[in-house]
């Protein structure tokens, strides 16, 4: 087979090479290098500027972000290179229906800011497993959830984004796939490991701007190439590969390509699944995922968090126009490559017999744009990759450090937590690189669908547990635990079946079991949600209700309750008493006191001499990890609240609410127009 791949002689035989003789010229590379230097400068500036020697400073950016970097970071964290590759690819293959995920997310991010975030703020939580620990007590739910979140991050986020970004870089720079990945990660890891969330948010803001400028520019070129929207609607249905078999339906554009709502039984995205099955994973992602919630918790106050969510919601309208439509244009301009239907030719073009729609966006960039702009779009793809990777790295590190490591070592010092958080980022990188070949082998032509199907099998049970915890005071730990377990087991069964019984190619008969073949993954999401909901409700109703302290401040209806002092300290607390100046123990009176550990008497009695003759290398490493000597005198409370009040300025609140109504109205109009 290898010899067959390399034997054709004609230099421009497209089936052999999706990007013949196309790459980056010196002008493009200059733009790309400038971008890298600029991002690195912003990352290092925020690293120096912000306080990173505390858990709050590193993991939550000190809790003083204003609305616009929060909004930009929400958008950039969501829109990774997987979006550019995946949305454009699905647009090329099946039309605009995939944009339903983006429009659905618009509503969900607003629900986060107006409904879920006030509960998280009232409960003074920093991670999502911590919320469940406070709401239900015990450790089994937070531990299961922390492990599940890390699993989802590695297998549906980090690996996919690295793979998608590396495809683009590999084709444009003609580098080895893994060399491209390692180069990207080297730059990404520097400011993620060093700067924490503040560096991530500031660089996200810069990268959002670059993404929008580049993607809007390419959209303009794309529509100009096909004669605008009317030309797109007319020519898309004529975009057929010349090597397609005439007596086969494979490779034909869908008749409903310009509709979001499609047939409930035979379509790729049935409309009941879009309305209901899609909404549950969307709620999980936008309202309970650590990556997203962590950005809003870093805001100065609730109003700034709402402003950031509104900004992200407005930006969520754009992917249909800057990713999906250009993907459809790419099919029109390059039908033989993007719309290939012959498995053997597809294998030669993009190493994927299932189809090559995922090359739609890179093909458009490298073939359509002039020198300089091509480099800008490369920067856009790198920005998308790096922004989502840094966000996931920081949030996964937060979960591992605060929810798993703190449980294993409840007396861990602040210094230890800072080091563990950074080392875990490096471990994540390694595991994700090892998983890339699996993504490469299993994604079946549409990368975005790979992500969404796995999400539909794992996320609904978690979303239902959060929803029940937030809105039904009777929900208890037993109900939440058994609901979570039943839903996850059912989802894992379907996930394993999907990997065993791979979807056949268009030209092959479908002999998969009925459970896999006939139940769409969005319908399965609805089934999972229903099973989890019934289990949580039934078990909670027939077992003891939760105590008052597990409900106060932790549901929508109790978020304004007066403070109830909890007897138990969170597992993060290393000591329950404080040492006074003379070394005598004194009982702690509040959770804020019990973190003021033995600073005074350590310097007095033990005189732990950390300073003698530290080499410059050691000092540099300690600075990189945010560990500085002056931090000894002001060790902060680990469980310090981020946003401490739900109060808002009445004028600002009114302005935000008016914007909310306008934004939702725009989204409903777009849904209706393209439905």
UniProtKB/Swiss-Prot annotation:
It is a multi-pass membrane protein. GO terms for cellular component: apical plasma membrane; plasma membrane. This is Sodium/myo-inositol cotransporter 2. Residues 49-65, 124-135, 202-208, 294-308, 397-418, 468-479, 543-654 are cytoplasmic. MI transport activity inhibited by D-chiro-inositol (DCI), phlorizin (Pz) and sodium (Na(+)). Insulin increases D-chiro-inositol uptake. The chain crosses the membrane at residues 28-48, 66-88, 103-123, 136-156, 181-201, 209-229, 273-293, 309-329, 376-396, 419-439, 447-467, 480-500, 522-542, 655-675. Pfam families: SSF. It is found in: Membrane; Apical cell membrane. GO terms for biological process: apoptotic process; myo-inositol transport. The gene is SLC5A11. It catalyses: myo-inositol(out) + 2 Na(+)(out) = myo-inositol(in) + 2 Na(+)(in); 1D-chiro-inositol(out) + 2 Na(+)(out) = 1D-chiro-inositol(in) + 2 Na(+)(in); D-glucose(out) + 2 Na(+)(out) = D-glucose(in) + 2 Na(+)(in); D-xylose(out) + 2 Na(+)(out) = D-xylose(in) + 2 Na(+)(in). Keywords: Apoptosis, Cell membrane, Ion transport, Membrane, Sodium, Sodium transport, Sugar transport, Symport, Transmembrane, Transmembrane helix, Transport. Involved in the sodium-dependent cotransport of myo-inositol (MI) with a Na(+):MI stoichiometry of 2:1. Exclusively responsible for apical MI transport and absorption in intestine. Can also transport D-chiro-inositol (DCI) but not L-fucose. Exhibits stereospecific cotransport of both D-glucose and D-xylose. May induce apoptosis through the TNF-alpha, PDCD1 pathway. May play a role in the regulation of MI concentration in serum, involving reabsorption in at least the proximal tubule of the kidney. Acts as an autoimmune modifier in systemic lupus erythematosus (SLE) as it is significantly associated with low complement component 4 (C4), anti-Smith antibody, serositis, and alopecia.
């Amino acid at each position: 087979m290898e010899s067959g791949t390399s034997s054709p002689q004609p230099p421009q035989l497209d089936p052999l090479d999706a990007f013949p003789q196309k790459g980056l010229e010196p002008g493009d590379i200059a733009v790309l290098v400038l971008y890298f230097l600029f991002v690195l400068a912003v990352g290092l500036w925020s690293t120096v500027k912000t306080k990173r020697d505390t858990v709050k400073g590193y993991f939550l950016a000190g809790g003083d972000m204003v609305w616009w970097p929060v909004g930009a970071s929400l958008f950039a964290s969501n829109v990774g290179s997987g979006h550019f590759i995946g949305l454009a690819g699905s647009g090329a293959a099946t039309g605009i229906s995939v944009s339903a995920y983006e429009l659905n997310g618009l509503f969900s991010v607003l629900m986060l800011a107006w409904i879920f975030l006030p509960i998280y703020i009232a409960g003074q939580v920093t991670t999502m497993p911590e919320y469940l620990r406070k709401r239900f007590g015990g450790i089994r739910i937070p531990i299961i959830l922390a492990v599940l979140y890390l699993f989802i991050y590695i297998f549906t986020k980090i690996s996919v984004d690295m793979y998608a970004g590396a495809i683009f870089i590999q084709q444009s720079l003609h580098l080895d796939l893994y060399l491209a990945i390692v180069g990207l990660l080297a730059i990404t890891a520097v400011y993620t490991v060093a700067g924490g969330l503040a560096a991530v948010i500031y660089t996200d803001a810069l990268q959002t701007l670059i993404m929008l400028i580049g993607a809007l520019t390419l959209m303009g070129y794309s529509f100009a190439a096909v004669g605008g929207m009317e030309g797109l609607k007319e020519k898309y249905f004529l975009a057929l590969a010349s090597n397609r078999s005439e007596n086969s339906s494979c490779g034909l554009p869908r008749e409903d390509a310009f509709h979001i709502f499609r047939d409930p039984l035979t379509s790729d995205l049935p409309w009941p699944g879009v309305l209901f099955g899609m909404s549950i994973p969307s709620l999980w992602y936008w309202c309970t995922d650590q990556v997203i919630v962590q950005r809003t918790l870093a805001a100065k106050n609730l109003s700034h968090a709402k402003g950031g969510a509104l900004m992200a919601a407005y930006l969520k309208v754009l992917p249909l126009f800057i990713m999906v439509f250009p993907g459809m244009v790419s099919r029109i301009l390059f039908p033989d490559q993007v719309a290939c239907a012959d498995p053997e030719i597809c294998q030669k073009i993009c190493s994927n017999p299932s189809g090559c729609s995922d090359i739609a966006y890179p093909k458009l960039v490298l073939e359509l744009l002039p020198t300089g702009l091509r480099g800008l779009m490369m920067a856009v793809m790198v920005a998308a990759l790096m922004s989502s990777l840094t966000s996931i790295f920081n949030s996964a590190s937060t979960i591992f450090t605060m929810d798993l490591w703190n449980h294993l070592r409840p007396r861990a010092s602040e210094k230890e937590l800072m080091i563990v958080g950074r080392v875990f980022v490096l471990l994540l990188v390694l595991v994700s690189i090892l998983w890339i070949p699996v993504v490469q082998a299993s994604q079946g032509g549409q990368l975005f669908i790979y992500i969404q199907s796995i999400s539909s099998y794992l996320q609904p049970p978690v979303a239902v547990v959060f929803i029940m915890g937030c809105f039904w005071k009777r929900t208890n730990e037993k109900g939440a635990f058994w609901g979570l377990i039943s839903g996850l087991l059912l989802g894992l069964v379907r996930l394993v079946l999907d990997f065993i019984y791979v979807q056949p190619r268009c030209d092959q008969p479908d002999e998969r079991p009925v459970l896999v073949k006939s139940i769409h993954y969005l319908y399965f999401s609805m089934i999972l949600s229903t099973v989890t909901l019934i289990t949580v409700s039934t078990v909670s109703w027939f077992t003891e209700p939760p105590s008052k302290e597990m409900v106060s401040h932790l549901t929508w209806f109790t978020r304004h309750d007066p403070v109830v002092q909890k007897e138990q300290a969170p597992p993060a607390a290393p000591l329950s008493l404080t040492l006074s100046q003379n070394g005598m123990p004194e009982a702690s009176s509040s959770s804020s006191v019990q973190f003021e550990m033995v600073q005074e008497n350590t310097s007095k009695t033990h005189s732990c001499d950390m300073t003698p003759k530290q080499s410059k290398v050691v000092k540099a490493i300690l600075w990189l990890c945010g560990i500085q000597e002056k931090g000894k005198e002001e060790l902060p409370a680990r469980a310090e609240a981020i946003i401490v009040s739900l109060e808002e300025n009445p004028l600002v609140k009114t302005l935000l609410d008016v914007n909310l109504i306008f934004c939702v109205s725009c989204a409903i109009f777009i849904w209706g127009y393209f439905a």
